[in-house]
Amino acid sequence: AALTSMAIGFAVTGLWWLLVTVPLIKNYKQINYVEKKEHAVRSAFRRIFETIRFIATKDKKVFFFLIAFFLYIDGVGTIIDNCINIGTDLNLSTVGQVICLLATQVVAFGGSLVFAKLSKKYDTVQLILVCIAGYFIVCLYALTLKNLIGFSFLAFGVGCFQGSIQSLSRSYFSKIIPPDNSGEYFGLYDIFSKGASFLG
């Protein structure tokens, strides 16, 4: 029964992301891009290293943001990963945990929409700080958990800021980088994101 529930959970999550990705695939158009070159791999690595050197020496705003992003996104990943461990420590049923985690994805989507609207009125950096503060409160709340109801509130809290902090970070990063070099810059962004998960 537990394996069936998990399989259903994965299937529903996959279907959910497929549905929300369709509008992007249908409507997205690449505006800034680099012309294809003969030695694509070698050229890509050369441009990446040139971008790293440029950011480290001349683009301090991007440099310091990437360092900050590396630190706080590692904390976000740790919190999300440990939700399962908390549920296990509380001896919650697998079904209950899966339902909460699925609900987290739905809440995360709604949270992203809310913060997207707020970003039109407030500074993006301030909203990122709000998300970080929200995660700090979620961590403190996690220390008081005793049952499934409490775990549900924890999942809701994580969901409120999960999609928001990721989308806000990406949005802010896109504003401070040169559009013509977005490929290299976002390549570094993803390296810092995945590197935080690996080292964390």
Please give the residue ranges for each predicted region.
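Short amphipathic helix-loop junctions that connect adjacent transmembrane helices
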Residues: D81-Q97
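C-terminal membrane-cytosol helix-exit motif in multi-pass small-molecule transporters
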Residues: G14-Y33
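Intracellular juxtamembrane helix-capping segments at the cytosolic ends
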Residues: S164-I177
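Juxtamembrane intracellular "pre-TM" segments in multi-pass secondary transporters
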Residues: I31-L66
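Helix-to-loop junctions at the C-terminal end of transmembrane segments
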Residues: G110-T124
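Helix-loop junctions at membrane interfaces in 12-TM secondary transporters
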Residues: L143-A155
